[in-house]
Amino acid sequence: MDMKKRIHLELRNRTPSDVKELVLDNCRSNEGKIEGLTDEFEELEFLSTINVGLTSVTNLPKLNKLKKLELSDNRISGGLEVLAGKCPNLTHLNLSGNKIKDLSTIEPLKKLESLKSLDLFNCEVTNLNDYRENVFKLLPQLTYLDGYDKEDKEAPDSDAEAYVEGLDDEDDEEDEGEEEDYDEDAAPGEEDEEEGEEDDEEEGEEEEEEDISGEEEEEEELNDGEVDDEEDFEEERGLKRKRELDEEGEEDDD
């Protein structure tokens, strides 16, 4: 897929000014140049063009807010002076896997005053004697070269990754905000359903209590009936016994 089509797909119905992060890795550039990218991407902060066949960055538009630029695994051998004019606020630049052979090629990066991290892995320039020491002298604004500072301390989470995660967090917060708005809209209906369920539960409990009360009353009535029957039976036995005694008394008198 060529770069223009890829950019169109990545827009996903957004306008260029809405885009903060643009990843074009592994697409194809025309004649080794950037194409389809315009200065309408004025809010762009992160651009990745890994392995797209670039030989030059001359067609890069003016991107004042661009902070991180991924250009690794291309065929760039010079022309980096363009970056200072087009991306003046760049803080992270990855040129790993390009055809950069000497320090003079990266010297124009001195004008990128905000440049904090530079990666040149797998470039011939890294084979030069005192490579790291000389690059830090040439570009005093640098904090990290190939992921390590002057004291050979590793950048925390590759510093650049932390920046990209920050962009992702912003997107997540926006998505969460949309979900919360949706939940608020749906809340009244849900509340009605919950109230209805609570009313049904209360009615069910009341009916159960009435059933239990009715059963208890029936048991009491049955018990009362049994007691009455026993009393009647005892009373009848008493009368019968009395009659027998009276009859015995009359016989004795005779």
From Swiss-Prot:
PANTHER family: ACIDIC LEUCINE-RICH NUCLEAR PHOSPHOPROTEIN 32 (PTHR11375), ACIDIC LEUCINE-RICH NUCLEAR PHOSPHOPROTEIN 32 FAMILY MEMBER A (PTHR11375:SF1)
Positions of the LRRCT domain: 123-161
Region of interest called Disordered, as start-end residue ranges on this chain: 166-254
Family in the record: Belongs to the ANP32 family.
The gene coding this protein: anp32a
LRR repeat ranges, renumbered to this chain: 16-40, 43-64, 65-87, 89-110
Matches recorded under InterPro entries: AN32 (IPR045081), Leu-rich_rpt (IPR001611), LRR_dom_sf (IPR032675), U2A'_phosphoprotein32A_C (IPR003603)
Keyword line: Cytoplasm, Endoplasmic reticulum, Leucine-rich repeat, Nucleus, Phosphoprotein, Repeat
GO molecular function, one term: histone binding
Organism superkingdom: Eukaryota
A cellular component annotation (GO) from this entry: perinuclear region of cytoplasm
PTM annotation, UniProt: Phosphorylated on serine residues.
Name under which the protein is recorded: Acidic leucine-rich nuclear phosphoprotein 32 family member A
Function recorded in the entry: Implicated in a number of cellular processes, including proliferation, differentiation, caspase-dependent and caspase-independent apoptosis, suppression of transformation (tumor suppressor), inhibition of protein phosphatase 2A, regulation of mRNA trafficking and stability, and inhibition of acetyltransferases as part of the INHAT (inhibitor of histone acetyltransferases) complex.
GO BP term (any one): nucleocytoplasmic transport
Compositionally skewed regions (Acidic residues) per UniProt: 166-235
Subcellular location: Nucleus; Cytoplasm; Endoplasmic reticulum
